[in-house]
Amino acid sequence: MGIKKFKPVTSASRYKSVLDFAEITETEPYKPLTLTLNYKAGRGDGGKIAVRHKGGRVKRKYRIIDFKRRKANIPAVVKSLEYDPNRSAFISLICYKDGEYSYILAPDGIKVGDTVQSGAGSEIKIGNAMPIGKIPPGTNVHNVELQIGKGGQIARTAGSFGTIAGRDGEYILLKLPSSEVRKVHENCYATIGICSNKDHNLVSIGKAGRSRWLGKRPSVRGVVMNPVDHPHGGGEGRTSGGRHPVSPWGQPTKGYKTRRSTRPSDKFIIQKRKRNRNR
């Protein structure tokens, strides 16, 4: 997948870049696997802002993705590779031998006409899903379950993956790009390969309007607000805030760990991810 850049004929196009979508084979989704979802624009049930900086995105249909891959030992043929506006990775429409259609996350390198399968006896091949305990060490996987039968939760975004690092009893050690090592039960499903669209992080938004299409509204700095609106607000002239960075509600930010220390899943984290000291 290549990156397309533009001549600076306008200020907006000077830094803008887009994917060339050369791998995409279908422009319209498969209608029986789409839904219309209500967009809340960051508002709660009372109509008040619950999450700031959201609203005004373009309309889109939700594609129903099969994250569980529990239709075992039935081969399926890849019919198309499609763009999904609801996620950064591409999706594939597959047709099982019994005639059922399904959407799955497209792994990098998959093509129309390829055959994929799920189940414990499946071949170690890109796009096949199986219990993570059946996958040999050193293999890259995506769409990894954390709870048996719940569906994939780890490595679902564009270009993401985890690597099988070893075994500890009935648990498999999964190493993530963040350097975190986590234990996953051997019966949890995972899909072979790296998630598609690995050039996604190279795309430059380029202009404010494109962010608005995605539903992202402008973010105002706290130091330019009044004291009633933000802890960093107020002061005569331009100030630096006068205190360590905090959120509008006073919680420390920029380096402050916000993960709850009593989460039950903490016992499955063997090695914590490294913190970037340069940020």
UniProtKB/Swiss-Prot annotation:
Keywords: Ribonucleoprotein, Ribosomal protein, RNA-binding, rRNA-binding. The keyword Ribosomal protein applies. Residues 270-279 have a biased composition (Basic residues). GO terms for cellular component: large ribosomal subunit. Gene3D superfamilies: 2.30.30.30, Nucleic acid-binding proteins (2.40.50.140), Ribosomal protein L2, domain 3 (4.10.950.10). It comes from the Bacteria. PROSITE patterns: RIBOSOMAL_L2 (PS00467). Pfam families: Ribosomal_L2, Ribosomal_L2_C. GO terms for molecular function: RNA binding; rRNA binding; structural constituent of ribosome; transferase activity. Signal peptide: none annotated. InterPro entries: NA-bd_OB-fold, Rib_uL2_dom2, Ribosomal_uL2, Ribosomal_uL2_bac/org-type, Ribosomal_uL2_C, Ribosomal_uL2_CS, Ribosomal_uL2_dom3, Ribosomal_uL2_RNA-bd_dom. Residues 216-279 are annotated as: Disordered. GO terms for biological process: cytoplasmic translation. One of the primary rRNA binding proteins. Required for association of the 30S and 50S subunits to form the 70S ribosome, for tRNA binding and peptide bond formation. It has been suggested to have peptidyltransferase activity; this is somewhat controversial. Makes several contacts with the 16S rRNA in the 70S ribosome. Belongs to the universal ribosomal protein uL2 family. Part of the 50S ribosomal subunit. Forms a bridge to the 30S subunit in the 70S ribosome. This is Large ribosomal subunit protein uL2.
